[in-house]
Amino acid sequence: MNFKYIVAVSFLIASAYARSVQNDEQSLSQRDVLEEESLREIRGIGGKILSGLKTALKGAAKELASTYLHRRRTAEEHEVMKRLEAVMRDLDSLDYPEEASERETRGFNQDEIANLFTKKEKRILGPVLSMVGSALGGLIKKIG
């Protein structure tokens, strides 16, 4: 009889333990679901804030670009514009990362690069050639 009593009590303890483990698993899974839902909400709010910031930055960059667009720029302002254009490209690449590399490679047109170099050469060579021309003119006057 003692043996039957011990087996019955052991069985009751084992079933109670199994139920508590099952309840713990259910509460953990419910907690996980609630936690995951709250994380989704937080990500959604963060995404909305990030998209708002990106929109504000894009708007500010476009406003600055339009301000500098219609007047003669200094070299410093030109560098600021280049940085703004880079920021705009970076912000666009956040929205569409797979298209960013295509846009960057399309942006480097060989004709545009050649035109940039010729503009730089003209800007550098113009004053140098005028100085050489005036020096040669002065030498010819002294000789002649």
Swiss-Prot record:
Keywords: Amidation, Amphibian defense peptide, Antibiotic, Antimicrobial, Cleavage on pair of basic residues, Cytolysis, Fungicide, Hemolysis, Secreted, Signal, Toxin. The modification Isoleucine amide is found at residue 143. Belongs to the bombinin family. This is Maximins 3/H2. Pfam families: Bombinin. It comes from Bombina maxima (Giant fire-bellied toad). It comes from the Eukaryota. The keyword Hydrolase does not apply. GO terms for molecular function: toxin activity. GO terms for cellular component: extracellular region. The keyword Signal applies. Its main location: secreted. Residues 1-18 form the signal peptide. Residues 19-43, 74-123 form a propeptide. GO terms for biological process: defense response to bacterium; defense response to fungus; killing of cells of another organism. Maximin-3 shows antibacterial activity against both Gram-positive and Gram-negative bacteria. It also shows antimicrobial activity against the fungus C.albicans, but not against A.flavus nor P.uticale. It has little hemolytic activity. It possess a significant cytotoxicity against tumor cell lines. It possess a significant anti-HIV activity. It shows high spermicidal activity. Maximin-H2 shows antibacterial activity against both Gram-positive and Gram-negative bacteria. It also shows antimicrobial activity against the fungus C.albicans. Shows strong hemolytic activity. Expressed by the skin glands. It is found in: Secreted.
